Amino acid sequence: MIISTTDKIPGYKIKEITGIVMGNIVHSKHLGKDIAAAFKTLAGGEIKSYTEMMTEARNKAIERMIDEAEKLGADAIVSVRFSSSAIMSGAAEILVYGTAVKLLPKDI
């Protein structure tokens, strides 16, 4: 599955748009790690547990979007965008969405 933030894939032309696809997840941290992160904010610097949480959540949201595209028979997802929002303290929603398409090589 080709995934791109652009609306075109080099070397291919879009044969068919199969639909809008998305994946989302609301992810939270373990209470103990949340408390440790609160202390880290006092000292400043990166809060690695939250960075890891957001990376994990983003990857899971992408997997879910790909699953939707595969169900539609798509070869690629173009115009991919990400959105995140805080749901509550220590929990965030990640939404990823794009347009699922079928491709043809440009020389055909």
From Swiss-Prot:
SUPFAM superfamilies per the UniProt record, alphabetical: YbjQ-like
Assigned protein family: Belongs to the UPF0145 family.
Name this protein carries in UniProt: UPF0145 protein Tmel_1129
Pfam families per record: YbjQ_1
Alphabetized InterPro entries for the sequence: UPF0145_dom_sf (IPR035439), UPF0145_YbjQ-like (IPR002765)
Segments traversing the membrane: none
Domain of life according to the entry: Bacteria
Gene3D superfamilies documented for this protein: Hypothetical protein apc22750. Chain B (3.30.110.70)
Species name: Thermosipho melanesiensis (strain DSM 12029 / CIP 104789 / BI429)
PANTHER family the UniProt entry points to: UPF0145 PROTEIN SCO3412 (PTHR34068:SF2), UPF0145 PROTEIN YBJQ (PTHR34068)
